[in-house]
Amino acid sequence: MLPKVLLMLLNMFLALQWRVGPHIKLENKPPAQDKVVFGPQPQPSGKKLPARETELTADHTTERPRGKLTRASQILNTILSNYDHKLRPSIGEKPTVVTVKVFVNSLGPISILDMEYSIDIIFYQTWYDERLRYNDTFETLILHGNVVSQLWIPDTFFRNSKRTQEYDITIPNQMALIHKDGKVLYTVRMTIDARCSLHMLNFPMDSHSCPLSFSSFSYDEHEMIYKWENFKLKIDAKNTWKLLEFDFTGVNNKTEIISTPVGDFMVMTFFFNVSRRFGFIVFQNYIPSSVTTMLSWVSFWIKIEAAAARASVGVSSVLTMATLGTFSRKNFPRVSYLTALDFYIAICFVLCFCTLLEFTVLNFLTYNNIERQASPKFYQFPTNSRANARTRARARTRARARARARQQQEVFVCEIVTYEENAEEGYQWSPRSRRPQCPWRRCGRSYVCFRVLRKYFCMVPGCEGNNWQRGRICIHVYRLDNYSRVLFPITFFFFNVVYWVICLNL
């Protein structure tokens, strides 16, 4: 019994030693090297880091960034604490000099109908403000967003702008860079729709200079002066400009003083020079006009008897040219003068109308010739004066018969008229011409016009051999088409030569 009790006590003692002994030993044992510890490691009591290590650790963690940020905030708060952004720098002492530079992101499109163009720019303005000077290791301070509104900014506005858009995504696209010597660089991005007076007299071979003028709105030349920064206009050539019908040819500038009721203001102006690409106008207007004019000459090769065909060709060409002339002015400003394109279309219209007029004259002359030959008169000299009384009665009867015959053009009327009948009807005999002469009051306008035309036009084959045509120009009516086949193309060719030489050299 006793041995069992001793054995149980021994086991209890050993178990107690196993639980307590190892825990005490682990506390005094240093941590293993391969164990990961998060956070600062515990240091043995009584051991301190050197002062140098403490300074470096603080400098690389919190003290150095907080120190710079604090100094920048102190500088900004100091210079803006007593700063009044409503007053310009050097007020009452000297004018503020503002240096200007422009960077062009894109130019165009140019609208000839609205007389305006669009331009996207980054506008730089530089001036000195003694109130913003500071003495520190910081060379510059950059302000953006709403903080810029706490500074004095030149009240520059664009004089010929219709609409101006500033960008505010993701923040307002403006920035102010303050140097330690008080120099301020203000940058803003904007898109401007500006007026551009286009003089379309040489259209479509025209060139234009679109201005962009700016000045101060409230400060005259005694308070604010604008200067070019060596006239630097940077252009982003890699960007695709939306000029469409124009080519950019260059830029120049001008500085002027404009007098207003409130003072004299300095105005700075950029001029963007562009020239038109007239390839589109050539295919849209010039080629159709030329082709229509040449197609109207087809009527010269159509027979005179085909009046309907020749009339349809002439009328169609005239109406087509009228349509082209109207269409060329569709997307065009309502100017009161003729452009180079209008002049070209007008000449083509005149040539087409002359083609139709040539057919009209030819048809009129040949028709009157046939009508006059259809009713010939045979004149008989009087043999006895006693026949006058008898012939007068017959003359009245024949006059009524002739009136009825003229109403029926198909009837061939052959009249025998004596000298007495001519005297009764008012005709006078001319021994030189051997034919009756018609007094002015008894002949209609058509007869007078016909007589005038007979002085220059030969309406009967072989008429140039007659005595009454001697010494006058003889033009054969039936040869008018032959003359026109040569005259019209030559005229149109020389017109094109003169037109393009003058227009391309303007």
UniProtKB/Swiss-Prot annotation:
The keyword Ion transport applies. The chain crosses the membrane at residues 278-298, 309-328, 345-365, 486-506. Residues 1-17 form the signal peptide. It comes from the Eukaryota. Expressed in brain and heart. Strongly expressed in locus ceruleus from the first postnatal day. Weakly expressed in other brainstem nuclei and in the hypothalamus. Found in the cerebral cortex of pups. One of its GO terms (biological process) is response to xenobiotic stimulus. It is found in: Cell membrane; Postsynaptic cell membrane. Pfam families: Neur_chan_LBD (PF02931), Neur_chan_memb (PF02932). Residues 299-308, 366-485 are cytoplasmic. Residues 18-277, 329-344 are extracellular. PROSITE patterns: NEUROTR_ION_CHANNEL. It catalyses: chloride(in) = chloride(out). Disulfide bonds join 196-210. InterPro entries: GABAA/Glycine_rcpt, GABAAe_rcpt, Neur_chan_lig-bd, Neur_chan_lig-bd_sf, Neur_channel, Neuro-gated_channel_TM_sf, Neuro_actylchol_rec, Neurotrans-gated_channel_TM. Belongs to the ligand-gated ion channel (TC 1.A.9) family. Gamma-aminobutyric acid receptor (TC 1.A.9.5) subfamily. GABRE sub-subfamily. NCBIfam families: LIC. GABAARs subunits share a common topological structure: a peptide sequence made up of a long extracellular N-terminal, four transmembrane domains, intracellular or cytoplasmic domain located between the third and the fourth transmembrane domains. This is Gamma-aminobutyric acid receptor subunit epsilon. It comes from Rattus norvegicus.
